Regions:
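Low-acidity, Ser/Thr- and Arg-rich intrinsically disordered low-complexity segments
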Residues: 1, 5-20, 26-34
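N-terminal metal-binding scaffold of metallo-dependent hydrolase/deaminase domains
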Residues: 32-80, 379
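Active-site gating loops and adjacent loop-to-helix segments of metal-dependent hydrolytic enzymes
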Residues: 108-139, 177-183, 247-289, 359
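Active-site core of metal-dependent hydrolases
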Residues: 208-328, 334-337, 342-343
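His/Asp/Glu-enriched, well-ordered alpha-helical/loop segment
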Residues: 263, 287, 326-402
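Alpha-helical scaffold segments that flank or form the walls of functional sites
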Residues: 64, 92-93, 110-173, 195-206
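Divalent metal-coordination and catalytic microenvironments
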Residues: 48, 63, 90, 101, ...
Length: 412
C-alpha cells in the first residue's frame, strides 16, 4: 500500500499563503497532511514526477515559480537549472484542486443525516437548516472553508440559497463561482422565487463575486421557472449548473410517471408541468437554451444521456445518500469534474477522498484523475489561471509525498 503526504507549496491567491493536499497514485492505506511555510522568492521545484496537466507527466521535471506564485517555466531535466537553486522533493508535483460542487452554507448540518436512506429522507434534514443560530452557521462555514484549504482546494463551485457564506468569501481565501439556486414547485410562486434569486445574485456580484442563477433539479423547477433562469443569463454569466439523475426515483418520475418522487410531488400539489412536459430529466437542457451547463451527480445517467456539457461527480455524497455510484465509463474524461457536495451529505471536504472512490470504481490512470481534480473543474468554472502548470497561470503547487507513517510534520 502507498500512503501519501502532501504539502502545498504555493496557493492560488497568494504565494505566501499555504494550503495542503493529499493525493493518490495506485492503492492507499493511510493519508496525512503537511503544511509548508516559506519565504517569498523565485523557486525551482522538482520531484520524482511533475504533472503539468497540459502535457504528459515529466520525470524529474522542474517547475519555476515567481514570487507571486505564477508559473514562469517548466524544465524537462534538472541539469537545466543550477543545482543550488533546486528544491528536491520525493513524490509528485501537481496543481491545486478545484471542488466543482459544494454547498458551503450547509456545513452546520454535518452528521445530522442518516446514511443510505435516500434523497427524500435526506431532504428532511435540509429543511432543518434554519433551526440554528447565525453564529453556528458562520462558524461552521469558516471551519469548512479552512478544511478545504487544508485539503489543497483552491477554487469552488458553490451552491447558494442564502447570503450566509458571503462574509467568509469576501476574505478571498479561495476562488468561488456562486450558483444562486432556485427551488419552486408551485407556478403561482415562480415570480417570488425568481425575484429573490435576482436579489441574491446581485448581492454576490456587488461584493465582487462570480454569481449565476441556476435551477436546483428537473423535479423541483417547473418549465416556466426554467425559462426565466435561461432569460436571466447575461454577459456576466459563464455557466449554469443543475443536480440531475441523482436518484432512480428522478428517472422514474419523468420516464414512467410513477415512483416515490411522483407520489411526493403529487402529495404536495406541485405543478404537474414538472413531469408532464418532460419525458427525461435531460429535457431541461432544451429549456436552458443550450447554455453551458455543469451537470452534477449523474448517478443514474446512461451513455445516451451524455452531451457535450461538463459533468461533476460527487461519489462520497452519492454513497452517503443513495449508496450508489455512476458508471464512470460513460463520461468524456476531458469534461468530467469532481466535487465534495456538502458536509450534510459527506464526512469531509476532501477531493482526495472523492478520488479514492473514483479510482476504485474506474480504470482512470493518475494523470486522468489529476485532470478531473484540477484542470477540468477550472475550465468548467472559468478560472483561467488555475488547473495546469501552463506559463502565466497561478494554480497553486501541491507536493504529494509517499510516506510510511501518518504523522503530521512541517517540512519547512
Amino acid at each position: 500500500c502507498l500512503a501519501l503526504k502532501l504539502g502545498s507549496l504555493c496557493s492560488a491567491q497568494n504565494f505566501c499563503k499555504s494550503s495542503t493536499l493529499v493525493f493518490l497514485m495506485s492503492f492507499f492505506s493511510s493519508i496525512s497532511f503537511t503544511k509548508i511555510y516559506y519565504f517569498c522568492a523565485m523557486r525551482f521545484l522538482t520531484a520524482d514526477y511533475l504533472f503539468p496537466l497540459y502535457i504528459a507527466p515529466i520525470k524529474e521535471g522542474v517547475l519555476q515559480i515567481s514570487d507571486d506564485g505564477q508559473v514562469v517555466a517548466i524544465f524537462k531535466n534538472r541539469i537545466e537549472v543550477p543545482q543550488d537553486k533546486l528544491e528536491i522533493f520525493e513524490g509528485i508535483l501537481c496543481p491545486g484542486f478545484v471542488n466543482a460542487h459544494c454547498h458551503l452554507e450547509l456545513s452546520h448540518l454535518k452528521g445530522n443525516a442518516e446514511k443510505g436512506k435516500g434523497f427524500l429522507e435526506f431532504s428532511k434534514i435540509i429543511r432543518q437548516r434554519d433551526n440554528y443560530t447565525d453564529t453556528d452557521k458562520l462558524q461552521a462555514i469558516e471551519k469548512a472553508e479552512q478544511e478545504m484549504i487544508a485539503n489543497g482546494i483552491v477554487a469552488v463551485g458553490d451552491i447558494c440559497n442564502t447570503g450566509d457564506t458571503l462574509v467568509q468569501k469576501q476574505k478571498e481565501h479561495l476562488k468561488y463561482y456562486n450558483f444562486i439556486e432556485t427551488f419552486g414547485v408551485y407556478v403561482n410562486k415562480v415570480d417570488i422565487v425568481y425575484n429573490q434569486a435576482i436579489e441574491l445574485r446581485n448581492e454576490f456580484r456587488s461584493a465582487g463575486q462570480k454569481a449565476s442563477i441556476v435551477a436546483h433539479a428537473p423535479y423541483s423547477v417547473p418549465p416556466v421557472l426554467m425559462r426565466k433562469i435561461n432569460n436571466a443569463f447575461d454577459d456576466n454569466d459563464e455557466l449554469l449548473t443543475i443536480h440531475i439523475q441523482e436518484t432512480k426515483e428522478e428517472n422514474q418520475l419523468f420516464e414512467n410517471k410513477k415512483g416515490n418522487f411522483f407520489d411526493w410531488l403529487r402529495g404536495i400539489n406541485a405543478t404537474s408541468s414538472i413531469w408532464l412536459n418532460r419525458n427525461k430529466s435531460t429535457y431541461v437542457l432544451q429549456e436552458l437554451g443550450g447554455k453551458k451547463v455543469l451537470l452534477v451527480h449523474n448517478t443514474f445517467a446512461k451513455k445516451e444521456d451524455i452531451t457535450d456539457n461538463y459533468y461533476c461527480t460527487c461519489p462520497r455524497a452519492n454513497l452517503y445518500i443513495e449508496n450508489a455510484l455512476p458508471d464512470y465509463s460513460i463520461f468524456d474524461t476531458d469534461k468530467l469534474c469532481v466535487g465534495t457536495d456538502s458536509l450534510a451529505s459527506n464526512d469531509s471536504l476532501s477531493i482526495l477522498d472523492e478520488l479514492l472512490i473514483i479510482q476504485s470504481n474506474s480504470n482512470f490512470d493518475l494523470n486522468t484523475l489529476l485532470k478531473i481534480a484540477c484542470k477540468n473543474g477550472a475550465k468548467a468554472l472559468g478560472f483561467e489561471k488555475l488547473g495546469t502548470f501552463e506559463k502565466g497561470k497561478i494554480p497553486g503547487v501541491n507536493l504529494i509525498k509517499s510516506l510510511a507513517d501518518t504523522k503530521i510534520t512541517k517540512l519547512i
